[in-house]
Amino acid sequence: QLILYIKTPTGQIKKLHFTSDLGSEYNRQPFVKSKDMVSSSNFSMFEATYNELGRGFNSKKECDKEREEFIKFLKDELSKNRSVLIGVFAQARQQSMMEFLYRNFKDDPNFKYPIYIDGVLGATLNNVYLSILEGEEKEYWQEVMSWKYFHYINSYEDSMSVALRKDETKIVLSSSGMFSGGRVVNHVKTTVENKNATIVICGYQGEGTVGH
């Protein structure tokens, strides 16, 4: 969160407070620090997309259950030689999904599938994470990024090549998260035509977007 002090023309000091998405206390994301309490401010502004009633989790148990179901779903799809496309936002969602997949599959001897990370902005933000994290968190993120099953796609030509390989059993993480722009569009076009492929929507989809 951000606290900004502004001096008015009359010499008064005003305190402005901004925090990113309030989210859910049960759905903690990797590398996100515990929130600090702010006792007062002259003006506070919050994001609350994922704090809407009915959108979040009511307990840690409920959150863990959904994650377990998602892992089971991925295992079932891959065991049937299906391709899985996951639309992600380049900032935060891609990194949390990478960490989630790494944490749950790194010690699984049966997991041997390529995971393509497709998106220029997402790749840039991966390195931003690396530059701002410190200590054990920095080492862990480097470990995640270096996992042998992650394959980073840089060029548009390579992106199209992966999208057209319909018979390949794989996971693709691509942006945008609402499927309305970016390289994910090409993956969607080939995935919806493929009976052996699945599209996963894992975030808010704004009205009027393809994902919605």
Question: What spans do the regions from the language model cover?
Answer:
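His/Asp/Glu-rich metal-coordinating catalytic cores
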Residues: 1-109, 114
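Hard-cation-handling environments
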Residues: 70-212
